[in-house]
């Protein structure tokens, strides 16, 4: 019996672990709950009709993009319904199952499929019961699975699922609180404390456009995109966080304005929670060459290429994409290209270089050799700036790009 089951598994037939009953989880949810919440809270109540229509269209696109990306990556095995519920055909995807899947992926990353084939197969089977995905039905598909969907992409997918589930649970909890509360809408707890305001000040728009045009690389595919709209980010940080940022800026100095690119399907989560420092794992995701930090660039199309999907072609190209413009406290910056950096790494035999004690950030220069987080030497085409403390970041604008009319 076990032999027959294993033979089926090798051909791509998998059981799926049912986490819970969809109907019971969805009992308090309502259609378009996620979209309605995002539109209600992200759009200022005093916005004019044209601005509301523009922002509603933007938010609708961000919600549907996340839905489409999760369905597409999983081959349709995982869907997000209109309420925001993340589900499979037989159950829902819970935070518990995602956390268990991450542990299983960690185990898989340390196994050699050729040396530990049975253990690898069992672990991969367990992973795909937790996070169902369409697989190749040909014999030996398990040998090629992580060539099709790399470990780094799987870690990113788990991160996306986790944020989607957390958002659904927060919105559902808010709905239940609102039903039992007598407070007015203004006093109700919010899922999104952020609001997006369309910038109409020509001086501000022209300044941002010039900063983009003056620092773009014509060799980048995204250099053909144009700045379409600029949205001011209001309320993402509370008063305490803003005061702390200003205090830190005075203490450390060297505050710079940099670009940060992110895929469209990540934007709602960032507008809800701010930027995060991705969890460490055995594999670098895009742009993790200099340690676990938040990556920025002064070269606009370096960041926009990431937003567009140039560095991540496996998940599609978005020609209508976005970048954040942020104030970043660089303070005392460590130059990864400095000759001393290589000597320091060799002398200490470090394999995990960044962050460097006594420094507030790292600058990796394009066109020269830099010491990476693993102690290797690499050459970059573009400048990258990395900070390791979220308190050093203040997102100011969400900038929309596309081909225009």
Language-model features: locations:
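Segments that shape or occlude catalytic/ligand-binding pockets
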Residues: 3-14, 176, 195-197, 243-405
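Hydrophobic transmembrane signal anchors and adjacent membrane-proximal interface regions, especially
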Residues: 78-80, 86, 93, 143, ...
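Eukaryotic extended interaction platforms
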Residues: 13-193
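Alpha-helix boundary/capping residues
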Residues: 5, 62, 108, 124, ...
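Residues that form generic nucleotide/phosphate-binding pockets
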Residues: 8, 57, 61, 211, ...
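Internal glycine-rich, Lys/Arg-flanked active-site/core loops of soluble domains
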Residues: 150-290
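Helix N-terminus capping/helix-initiation residues
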Residues: 44, 94, 147, 201-202, ...
């Amino acid at each position: 019996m076990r032999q027959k089951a294993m033979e089926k598994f090798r051909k791509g037939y998998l059981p799926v672990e049912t986490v819970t009953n969809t109907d019971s989880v969805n009992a308090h949810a309502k259609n378009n709950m996620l979209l309605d919440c995002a539109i209600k809270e992200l759009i200022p109540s005093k916005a004019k009709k044209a601005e509301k229509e523009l922002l509603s269209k933007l938010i609708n696109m961000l919600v549907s993009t996340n839905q489409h990306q999760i369905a597409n990556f999983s081959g349709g095995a995982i869907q997000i319904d209109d309420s925001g519920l993340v589900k499979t055909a037989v159950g829902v995807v819970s935070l518990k199952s995602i956390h268990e899947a991450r542990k299983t992926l960690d185990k898989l990353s340390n196994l050699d499929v050729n040396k530990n084939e049975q253990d690898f197969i069992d672990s991969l089977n367990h992973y795909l019961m937790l996070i169902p995905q369409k697989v190749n039905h040909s014999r030996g598909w398990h040998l090629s699975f992580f060539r099709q969907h790399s470990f780094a992409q799987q870690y990113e997918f788990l991160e996306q699922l986790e944020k989607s589930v957390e958002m659904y649970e927060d919105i559902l909890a808010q709905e239940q609180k609102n039903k039992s509360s007598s407070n007015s809408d203004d006093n109700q707890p919010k899922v999104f404390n952020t609001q997006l305001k369309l910038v109409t000040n020509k001086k501000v728009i022209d300044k941002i456009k010039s900063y983009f045009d003056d620092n773009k690389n014509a060799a980048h595919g995204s250099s053909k995109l144009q700045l379409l709209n600029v949205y001011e980010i209001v309320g993402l940080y509370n008063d305490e966080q803003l005061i702390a940022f200003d205090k830190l800026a005075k203490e450390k100095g060297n505050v710079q304005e940099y670009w940060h690119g992110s895929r469209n399907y990540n934007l709602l989560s960032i507008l809800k929670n701010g930027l995060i420092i991705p969890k460490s794992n055995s594999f670098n995701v895009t742009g993790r060459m200099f340690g676990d930090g938040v990556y920025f660039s002064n070269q606009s199309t370096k960041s926009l290429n990431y937003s567009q999907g140039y560095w991540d072609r496996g998940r599609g190209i978005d020609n209508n994409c976005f970048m954040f413009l942020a104030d970043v406290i660089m303070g005392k910056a460590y130059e990864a290209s400095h000759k001393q950096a290589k000597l320091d790494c060799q002398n200490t035999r470090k394999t995990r270089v960044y962050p460097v004690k006594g420094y507030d950030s790292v600058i990796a220069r394009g066109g020269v050799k830099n010491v990476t987080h693993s102690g290797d030497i690499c050459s970059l085409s573009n400048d990258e700036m990395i900070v390791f403390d979220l308190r050093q970041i203040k997102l100011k604008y969400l900038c929309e790009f596309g081909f225009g009319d």
